[in-house]
Amino acid sequence: QILTGLFLAMHYTSDTMTAFSSVTHICRDVNYGWLIRYLHANGASMFFICLFLHVGRGLYYGSYMYLETWNIGVLLLFAVMATAFMGYVLPWGQMSFWGATVITNLLSAIPYIGSDLVEWIWGGFSVDKATLTRFFAFHFILPFIIAALAGIHLLFLHETGSNNPSGLSSDADKIPFHPYYTIKDILGVLLLILALTSLVLFSPDLLGDPDNYTPANPLNTPPHIKPEWYFLFAYAILRSIPNKLGGVLALVLSILILAVVPFLHTSKQRSMMFRPFSQCLFWILVADLLTLTWIGGQPVEHPFIIIGQLASILYFLLILVIMPITSLFENNLLKW
C-alpha cells in the first residue's frame, strides 16, 4: 500500500482544480498507472478484509487477554480507518466531496466546540482547497505512523508470545519459524495476491461508487451518500439513531467497544474452542455485522430503518450483555 501510494503521489496533485484530472491522467497516461491506482484502491479493501478477520479471530480465541497488544490493535484500527477515509477524499469525485462533508460535519455534534472544530479541520467554511491539501498530507504521513504502531503491536505480542486456538500455553509445542511458518505464510500471501489481482484485473470498480467518476460539485448532492463497503456497518449504526450526537457516539463506540471486551470476559476458558454456546453467539454477531453492512448501503426507507435499528441494538447487546452472561452459564454447565 505504501509503495503503490508513493508512486501515485508522484503523479497526483492535491489541488481542487487538478486533483480529479490528475487521477484521470494517472489512469490514462502514466505507464501502468491504472494498475497502480486500482492496486492501491482495492488493496485497501483487502487490507480491511484482513483486519476484520484478524479482529474476529482475536475475539473468537480470546487473544484480547493480552491487553497491551489488543489496545494498540484497537488504536491501529482507528488509524487505518482515518487513513482510508482521507484517501477516499483525494480523487475529488462526487462521493469524495460529499463523504468528506458528511463525515467531518459529524464533529459539529460535539457540544460547545463542535462548529469551531469542524471549521478548523476544513480550513474554511466548507470542504475546499485547504481541506483537500491537508487530507493529502495526513493520508501520506499516517501509514508510516501505522507501520510504527504495528511494530509496537508486535513488540508487546513478543512479551507474551502468541495465543493459539486452544487458549492453552504453546510453550511445549513451539517450532522454528523458518521453514515451517514461512512456508505456511507463503500460502496465505499467495492466496491474498491471487484475490487482489483477480479483483484488480477483472472488476476493479466492483467495490467503488460510480458517483466518484463525476467530478466534485458542491451545488449537486448525490441521491445516496454512502462510504466504501468497509465503513457501512458503522454508517448503519450511525444512521440508526435519530439524534446527531447520539449517532456520533454510537459510531465511535461501535469500534471503541473492542477495548471493553477484555473486561467482559467472564468465562473460565480463554478460547471459544470448547464453548459451543459462545460459538453460536459469535457467528450471530458476524451475521449481525453483515446485516449492518447491507443496511448501510441501503436508502433510509421503511423496511431498512427498523432492520438497521434492531441490528444496531443486537450488536451492542451481544457484546455487552448476552455473551458475558452466556459465558457464566457455560461455566456452570461444566460445574466450574
Curated annotation (Swiss-Prot):
The cofactor remark states: Binds 2 heme b groups non-covalently.
What are the record keywords, sorted? Electron transport, Heme, Iron, Membrane, Metal-binding, Mitochondrion, Mitochondrion inner membrane, Respiratory chain, Transmembrane, Transmembrane helix, Transport, Ubiquinone
Q: Which domain of life is it from?
A: Eukaryota
The reply to whether Transmembrane figures as a keyword in the UniProt entry is: yes
Where do the coiled-coil regions begin and end? Answer: none
Instruction: Write down the InterPro entries for this protein, in alphabetical order.
Output: Cyt_b/b6_C (IPR005798), Cyt_b/b6_C_sf (IPR036150), Cyt_b/b6_N (IPR005797), Cytb/b6-like_sf (IPR027387), Cytochrome_b (IPR030689), Cytochrome_b_C_euk/bac (IPR048260), Cytochrome_b_N_euk/bac (IPR048259), Di-haem_cyt_TM (IPR016174)
Instruction: Give compartment(s).
Output: Mitochondrion inner membrane
Q: Does the keyword Metal-binding apply?
A: yes
> What is the topology of this protein in the membrane according to its UniProt annotation?
Multi-pass membrane protein
- In this chain, heme b b562 is annotated as bound at 40, 139
The biological processes this protein is annotated with in GO are:
mitochondrial electron transport, ubiquinol to cytochrome c
Positions of transmembrane segments: 1-10, 34-55, 70-90, 135-155, 183-203, 245-265, 277-297, 304-324
What cofactor does its activity depend on?
heme b
Annotated residues that bind a ubiquinone are located at 158
Residues of the signal peptide = none
Q: What else is known?
A: Heme 1 (or BL or b562) is low-potential and absorbs at about 562 nm, and heme 2 (or BH or b566) is high-potential and absorbs at about 566 nm.
Role played:
Component of the ubiquinol-cytochrome c reductase complex (complex III or cytochrome b-c1 complex) that is part of the mitochondrial respiratory chain. The b-c1 complex mediates electron transfer from ubiquinol to cytochrome c. Contributes to the generation of a proton gradient across the mitochondrial membrane that is then used for ATP synthesis.
Question: What is the protein name given in its UniProt record?
Answer: Cytochrome b
> Native species of this protein?
Sorex arcticus
Lineage start? Eukaryota, Metazoa, Chordata, Craniata, Vertebrata
